[in-house]
Amino acid sequence: MARQVKRKSGADRNDGGGKYNSNNDRSVKRGRSELRTVTRTSRRDRGQDEQHNSHGTGGDFDIEGNVKDGRENVEQDKEEEEEEEDEDKGKAYEALLTLLKIEQKQEMKSGNKMENGRGLENTGSETGEKDNSAVKDDEDEDEDDFGEDENAGVVLEDQKEEEEEEKEDEDEDEEEEEDDEDTPAGINNDAFELHFNQPTEEYLEQEDKLVLKENAKWNIHKKESYDDLSLTSITQSPPGSSITIPSSLLKQKGTDISEYPLKKRVYTAFESTYGPSISKLESILLQPILNYQDINYQYKTFLNSSYRKLYALHALNHIYKTRDRILKNTAKLHQLNEDGDDLELRDQGFTRPKVLILLPTRDACNEIVEMIIKLSGTDQQENKKKFTTQFYTKAETRTNKPGDFQDAFKGNNNDFFCIGMKLTRKTLKLYSSFYSSDIILASPLGLSMILENPDKKKRQYDFISSIEVLIVDRANQIEMQNWDHVNTVMKYINKVPKEFHDADFSRIRMWSINDQAKLLRQTLVFSEYQTPAINNLVSSKSHNLAGKIRFKPVITSENSIMNSIGLRIKQVFQRFPSESPLADPDSRFKFFTNSIIPHLLQSSSYGNGIMIYIPSYFDYLRVKQHFKDSTKYNFGAIDEYSSQSKLTRTRHEFALGKIQIILYTERLHYFRRYEISGVKNLIMYVPPSNPLFYKELIRFIGKSVFKEECDLDLTWAKLIYSKWDANALERIVGNERAPVLCSSQNEQYEFR
C-alpha cells in the first residue's frame, strides 16, 4: 500500500541536475512556489495505515506539521535499522551529497524528521528504478521545473562500496593496447606523456615566474590561413620556452582517424559511430586538441556542431590514458615492493576528476553525454534512465523563431545542473559522487552554487583542484546567461584543496603539489562569435605552456551579415573618440548625450518610432536614467527583467505611436526574439554582439516599411562605435571595411 508525502521545497531540498541547494534556494528559483509529491511503499499493515489516515486526508500530510504523528506510526526496529543505514550513507565523500546529508542527518538526530527524512532517502537508494513513481514532479509544475527536485548528482552509496566495486572492475583482464606507451618510441610520440609527465621541476619553476608572477607577454609563434575553409589561425607560445612537441606530432595529419594517437577502445568506438574519416576542418582542430594546446574556436553558426565529437573523443582519450598509466604504475610498484626495490612514480592529482565541461543547458548536457556514451566503448551505463528523465524532454521551441533561437532553447533549457560521470572498464556511471568522478559536466550557475555556498563551512571546491582539461562549449549562450559564474569557476579551478581526501602523496605529481597545475591545464573554448569576455578566458586566464591557438573565420564584405539584409535602408556608422577600452563606456555615454540625444527627434522625419538598442544592461540603466532626469521625451524602456505586462503594454503603445522612443536591451532580444512593430528609425548604442541581431534589428524597419507606416527613403539606422569595437564591426561589415571604419580620418560612413 502506498501513501503520499507532500512537502514544500526548502533548504534541505535536492534539485535535479546535481545542483547545489542552500537556504536561499527560493531566490535562485526566481521566487517560484514549488510543491513536490513523493510516493513511497509503506511497510505497515492495513490497520496502521487506516489509523494514520485518520489524522489527515487521503494519507497526505505536511512533514513539518505532522512529525509527531509520523513518529507514532513507525516501528522501533525499522527506525533503528534505517538510522544505521543513514549513518553509513552519510560517510559518502562527495561535495553535493555532503551538503545535503549534513542537513538531513542533523534534523533526524534532533527528531524533527524521523521517518519522512529516511523515507526520502530510501526512495532513492532502495527502490531506485524499480519504483518509477518514487520521486516525481507535481503535475501543475511549469515545464522549466521538470526534474528539478530529483536527486541528480547525489550518491547515496558508501564511498568504500564504490572503491571496492571499482577495484574489482580494475582487476578484470583487458586486451592490451597494440602500442606500448612505456617504450621510448611510445613516450616520444605520446602528447599525454610529454605534456603531463616530462616537464622538469626547474622548467616549471622558471615558467611559473615568467607566466604567473611577472605576467610576461606571450609570443606570436605562427599564423596560418586556410583559404578553402575561410579560416585563419594564430598560435601563441609562452614567454621563455614552450613544452617541446616533436615534429611527428606537429606535422599535419590527414583525415583518416587511424593516424591519430588514440586509445584503441576510443578509436574503435569512433570509427563505428562516425566512420573512419573526418573532414579537413576536423583534422585541423583535432591535432592541436590531442597535443594539449589551448583552443579558441569560433564555429560561426549553430549548424557547425561537428567539433563536439572531437572534444568528447579527446576527453575520453585523456581519461583512459590517465587510467591506464595509473594501473601500469601500480603494477610496477607492486612488483618492486615484492622484490624489495623502491621507485617513485607520480601520475595523479589531488582528486580524481580530470575533465570539466561547462555547458549552458541540460539539453546541451544530454547531447554531450549521449555522444560520450557512444564513444566510451562501455557495455553498460548506470543511472541512464534517471538522467534521461531529468535532462531530456521532447518539448520544442516555437517554429516562428530563428533557427539559432530554436537550437539554444530546445528541449530542457534549464541552466541549473552539475553531474559527475565515472568511467570503469565496462561501465559508464552517471550521478557518481564528484570525488569519484572522472568527468564533471555542469552549467556555470550549477557549479558556482557549490563553489560559493553562502555558508563558508559548506563550500566545496576541492573536486576541481586537479582538472587537466577544461572545455567551455556554446560560450555565447553562457555569456547571455551570466558570465560572472564562469569567472567564479576560474577562480577556484586548480586551486590547492583544503583537504587532501586520502590522496597518496607519493603518487601526486610535483607540479600539483607546487600549485603549478594551471600551467599544464588545457582550455578549449567554442563559441559562435568572439567577445572580449570569451577571448579573455583563453588569452588571460589560461596559462597552458603547450601554447594557444585562436581560430578565426574570414568574414569578407561578400559574406558579411550586412550583405544579407536584402533592404536598401540607409545605415550610418558614427565613430566617436575613445582613449582606452576602460574609458570607452564613459566616452560613449558622453558622445551620446551631447551629440545624439539633443537632435534625436529633429534628425527623424517622424515624431515617433525611434528604437535605441543597448547591449549592456549597465549602459541601459545609465541611458534610461538620463532620459528620465534630463530630457522631456516620451519614452519607454523594456529589458530582460521587465514583467510580461510591461513588455506587452510598452510594445503596444510604441506600435501605436503613443511612445516616441523605446529603449531595448540585447539580452531581452536574445531571450524573447521579439519582432517590434512601429520602428521607423534605429540607433544602436553599441554594435550588437551577435551579427544576426544586426540583421534582425534592421528588419524591424523593413516591417514598418512593408506595412506602409513609413517611407523607405526616410528611414535610417545609426550605429555608434569606437576603434575598440573592431571585432564586432568586422562581423557586420567584413574584414576589409572594418579597419577603414576604425582608423581612417572620416568619422561617419553611410551604407545602403
Swiss-Prot record:
The keyword Transmembrane helix does not apply. Belongs to the UTP25 family. Its main location: nucleus. One of its GO terms (biological process) is maturation of SSU-rRNA from tricistronic rRNA transcript (SSU-rRNA, 5.8S rRNA, LSU-rRNA). Transmembrane segments: none annotated. Residues 77-87, 137-151, 159-183 have a biased composition (Acidic residues). DEAD-box RNA helicase-like protein required for pre-18S rRNA processing, specifically at sites A0, A1, and A2. GO terms for cellular component: nucleolus; small-subunit processome. GO terms for molecular function: rRNA binding; U3 snoRNA binding. The keyword rRNA processing applies. This is U3 small nucleolar RNA-associated protein 25. Keywords: Nucleus, Ribonucleoprotein, Ribosome biogenesis, rRNA processing. PANTHER family: ORF PROTEIN-RELATED, U3 SMALL NUCLEOLAR RNA-ASSOCIATED PROTEIN 25 HOMOLOG. It comes from the Eukaryota. Residues 26-53, 65-76, 102-118, 127-136 have a biased composition (Basic and acidic residues). It is found in: Nucleus, Nucleolus. Residues 1-189 are annotated as: Disordered. Component of the ribosomal small subunit (SSU) processome composed of at least 40 protein subunits and snoRNA U3. InterPro entries: P-loop_NTPase (IPR027417), UTP25 (IPR010678), UTP25_C (IPR053939), UTP25_NTPase-like (IPR053940).
